[in-house]
Amino acid sequence: MIIKNGQVLLFEEGGFVKRDILVKDGKIIKVAEGISPEEAGEEIVDAKGKFITPGLIDAHSHICISEEGMGAIADDCNDYSDAVMPYLETIDGINPFDLAVDTAVKAGVTSACVCPGSDSVVGGICSVVKLKGKVAEEMVLERKAAVKCSFGENPKRAGYSFKTRMGNAYLLRKCIEDAIDYKHRKEEAAKDGSYFRTDIGMENMLPLLEKKIPLHAHVHRADDVCTAIRIAKEYGLKLVIVHCTDGISIVDFLSKHDYPVILGPTMYPRSKLESMGRCFETAGVLNKAGIKICITADHDVTPIYYLSVYAAQSVRAGLDEIEGLKAVTKNPAEVLGIDDRKGELMAGRDADIVIWSKHPFDYDTKVEKVFLEGQDMTI
């Protein structure tokens, strides 16, 4: 397949440029001017006058585990069994037939990080998925992508044994310390050949200790952001700061630490105290300070299929336009560790391609075609 004559988003070129895209076997083979039709086989898509981007990526979502329109019976986001549950994995709660999936794809969203809810201090393991497939295993790109933890209002109000920020920080530290102890005991048992009983939760924590995956930290208030950074630095952990609602008030502090930020949701009522400071201006301020940002819908808090709208509103509020496009494509791919496959239109990447009628941030634009790994999802 060749997609011809479109305005293709190429970050190394500084924006949209006229190019053709050659796709074979679900992969982008070449992005160049004047690709010969003979290279395409029978399928040629004329995108003259259209804008073409990578498939959009939401770096923090509850799609497929908090199902749209189904109520509490299909909400597998928060388990409410304990404050610390590293043994839970979102892959075991994913329903590929969530109604939101089809709507999201038709709005240009092709991948997402599916996370446990935020009412436990340690909620479980996040999985990165492509929004295509009939079983979870077909969807999963990274089964164990991050350890979800939460600070502030949500775990405080959940009613577990500890009800203060101090107590919740202690529980997270204790979980990490338990994992360190588990790692040492496992290594000693391997040396002397003694019996060692595997613990599912602690096994899930080991990639975090080894810096293979990050701590995916739900934080809104500025002091909670600082606590998450404090704990990450204490243990030398990778960290992704999620929500960061009050980030604009501590931008100088954030800029001194090399942690990416996933901003949002923003386009919703101030439903709790911690959301009082939410504003679209935060994205531009953090970006100008050199902080890598992603933009999230936090589905189903706000709909994932309006992800491009949230990015556009951030641009309207001061975020650079190209940085706004990166915040829903390239940046989340890098933060989620899937940038070898997703996030940019270049040779070797998956053919996750969205064709828009106008610029993606134009109020009147429409998604005309979506290809996910080369498959036309809009048929």
Question: Model regions: which residues?
Answer:
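N-terminal metal-binding scaffold of metallo-dependent hydrolase/deaminase domains
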Residues: 1-39, 50, 375
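C-terminal cap of metal-dependent C-N hydrolases
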Residues: 4-10, 334, 346-379
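Divalent metal-coordination and catalytic microenvironments
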Residues: 6, 21, 26, 49, ...
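Metal-coordinating catalytic core of metallo-dependent amide/deamination hydrolases
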Residues: 39, 128-230, 234, 272, ...
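Metal-associated gating/positioning segment near the N- to mid-region
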Residues: 50-116
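Active-site gating loops and adjacent loop-to-helix segments of metal-dependent hydrolytic enzymes
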Residues: 67-94, 135, 140, 150, ...
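His/Asp/Glu-enriched, well-ordered alpha-helical/loop segment
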Residues: 68-69, 73-81, 85-87, 214, ...
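Divalent metal-dependent hydrolysis catalytic cores, especially in the metallo-beta-lactamase
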Residues: 83-89, 97-132, 141-154, 214-215, ...
